[in-house]
């Protein structure tokens, strides 16, 4: 999976992975569409768009929910997140009525497979696609609740009317979501994008990370204060864990970065210091 980290909001040519001080602009690492279907056979994993809302009679009058996730590994764990905004491009708006499009935090992991659909009806799911019933199609990993397991709390909402670019402004809940994912990356399951699920033809289509025009991809902007360097984190992964213990033991008796008390050699005192700061 590919994602990009941009140095500014000005996109010139192809998007590359770089960083800017205390701000990053990231394109998704995965996105997809949950398509309401009693058999759970449809998905849009590799399509250039995803959907949120309810389709019309010709589409079965069923619900669509977007799924979007961003790789936040460029932010050092325990950095302080201060602002989070999401920009998405609505490329088809149906009846062009104003509809609320909300972000809700997923509580379980999900997949993006190779299914390609040319409309909101989706295509037959491919291995590891999410579907209405499956988190990873072709496996036994199912949603507890058909249609996705996500929070009832709205992290952010934005009225979307016609086609164009829309920004979901920073909220305390968006900040809290990203902060939790930065501190514990294994819990980063992204957001469910939820529209008006009552009114027929309320569905909105958003361009995905697979869209051919780079500037139309979704982008997450995160502003943060980097965590101060931790001398116990010898491997610089943001945690004091087994990798750091291995590094310390590998330099035992020598003058190295693991000599925390500057005694001239790594010894039991340094081992005790590392274990006292253990984060796992």
What are these regions (language model features)?
Residues 1-9:
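Bacterial N-terminal signal peptides that target proteins for export
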Residues 225-280:
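Cellulosome-associated attachment modules in secreted, modular CAZymes
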Residues 78, 89-98, 199-201:
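Extended, low-complexity, turn-rich repeat/linker tracts enriched in Gly/Pro/Ser/Thr and Asp/Glu
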Residues 21-74, 111, 197-200, 210-226:
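Flexible, small-residue-rich N-terminal segments that precede or flank a structured functional core
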Residues 70, 80-92, 220:
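A short beta-strand element within beta-rich, extracytoplasmic domains
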Residues 28, 93-180:
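Beta-strand-rich interaction/scaffold domains
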Residues 171-214, 223-226:
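Ser/Thr/Pro-rich, low-complexity mucin-like regions
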């Amino acid at each position: 999976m590919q994602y990009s980290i941009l140095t500014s909001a000005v996109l010139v040519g192809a998007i590359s992975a770089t960083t800017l001080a205390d701000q990053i602009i990231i394109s998704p690492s995965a996105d997809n569409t949950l398509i309401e279907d009693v058999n759970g056979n449809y998905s849009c994993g590799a399509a250039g768009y995803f959907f949120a809302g309810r389709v019309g009679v010709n589409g079965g009058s069923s619900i669509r929910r977007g799924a979007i996730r961003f790789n936040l590994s460029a932010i050092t764990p325990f950095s302080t997140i201060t602002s989070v905004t999401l920009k998405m491009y609505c490329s088809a708006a149906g009846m062009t009525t104003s509809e609320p499009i909300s972000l809700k935090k997923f509580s379980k992991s999900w997949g993006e497979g190779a299914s390609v659909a040319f409309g909101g009806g989706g295509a037959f799911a491919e291995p590891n696609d999410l579907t209405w019933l499956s988190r990873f199609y072709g496996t036994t990993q199912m949603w507890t609740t058909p249609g996705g397991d996500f929070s009832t709390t709205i992290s952010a909402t934005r009225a979307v009317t016609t086609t164009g670019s829309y920004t979901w402004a920073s909220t305390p809940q968006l900040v809290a979501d990203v902060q939790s994912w930065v501190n514990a990356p294994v819990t980063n399951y992204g957001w469910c994008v939820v529209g008006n699920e009552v009114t027929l033809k309320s569905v909105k289509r958003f361009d995905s990370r697979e869209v051919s025009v780079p500037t139309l991809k979704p982008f997450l902007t995160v502003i943060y204060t980097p965590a101060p360097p931790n001398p116990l984190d010898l491997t610089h992964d943001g945690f004091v864990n087994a990798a750091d213990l291995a590094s310390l033991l590998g330099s035992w008796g020598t003058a190295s970065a693991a000599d925390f008390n500057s005694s001239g050699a790594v010894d039991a005192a340094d081992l005790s210091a590392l274990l006292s700061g253990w984060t796992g």
